[in-house]
């Protein structure tokens, strides 16, 4: 969380810039970007007061998932129940990517074995997926590449999605390494951390981007 202050004081930040991290964490700005890319998201809103949150929840319909910005692993997230609709029976999945700011590589898509909205500490995933169709796998990879390239991510990125009624929705983007990187690296035989390190230090080393085709 100190990256922005360091940058303001002249410290060069390697990899993804603090402004891109802000873009991913600010729910309103991120939704604007998804609208621009024509990538669907569940209905949502951003509130700074209880009254605003109640108004947004009333428009969306219950149950709603409430979570703060700038947190890791679903910390502070709550599901508020009532009677209406949300992504009631959605399958959650995620994808890790390596990007050099212009091109992105998505080695795999992981399928969660619990429904969308479970805290990451209580979640588990499988790779390769069992229940995600080939069409949706390609859609997830395409969305991940588009978002990484639009945000000019440099290094690792994690995307979380939900699939309901055979439609893929973006839940959030995390322009950083995630807990699933070791799993993807091992299963796909892709050295993701060394590749990301080469990318974020390429300006210093002068070596070309190692993003795989």
Question: What is each residue range found by the language model?
Answer:
Residues 1-10:
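Short Gly/Thr/Asp-enriched flexible loops that form oxyanion-binding sites at enzyme active sites
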Residues 3-4, 56, 81:
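Catalytic core of soluble alpha/beta enzymes
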Residues 7-8, 30-32, 44-45, 68-70, ...:
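Generic detector of short, locally flexible boundary/turn motifs and exposed helical patches
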Residues 11-15, 37, 60-63, 72-73, ...:
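ATP-dependent carboxylate activation and anion-phosphoryl transfer catalytic cores
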Residues 14-77:
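A conserved helix-loop-beta module that forms one wall/lid of the active-site cleft
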């Amino acid at each position: 969380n100190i990256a922005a202050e360091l940058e303001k004081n002249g410290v060069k930040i390697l990899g993804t810039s603090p402004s891109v991290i802000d873009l991913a964490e600010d729910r309103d700005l991120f939704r604007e970007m998804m609208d621009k890319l024509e990538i669907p998201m569940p209905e949502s809103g951003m509130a700074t007061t209880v009254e605003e949150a109640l108004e947004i929840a009333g428009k969306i319909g219950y149950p709603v998932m409430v979570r703060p910005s700038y947190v890791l692993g679903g910390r502070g997230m709550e599901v508020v129940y009532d009677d209406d609709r949300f992504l009631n029976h959605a399958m959650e999945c995620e994808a890790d990517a390596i990007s050099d700011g212009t091109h992105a590589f998505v080695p795999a898509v992981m399928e969660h074995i619990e429904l969308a909205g479970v805290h990451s500490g209580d979640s588990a995933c499988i790779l390769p997926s069992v229940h995600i169709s080939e069409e949706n796998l390609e859609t997830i990879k395409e969305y991940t590449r588009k978002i990484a390239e639009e945000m000019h991510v440099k290094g690792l990125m994690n995307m979380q999605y939900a699939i309901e009624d055979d439609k893929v929705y973006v839940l959030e983007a995390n322009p950083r390494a995630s807990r699933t990187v070791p799993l993807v690296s091992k299963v796909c035989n892709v050295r993701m951390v060394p590749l990301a390190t080469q990318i974020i230090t390429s300006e210093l080393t002068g070596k070309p981007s190692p993003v795989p085709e």
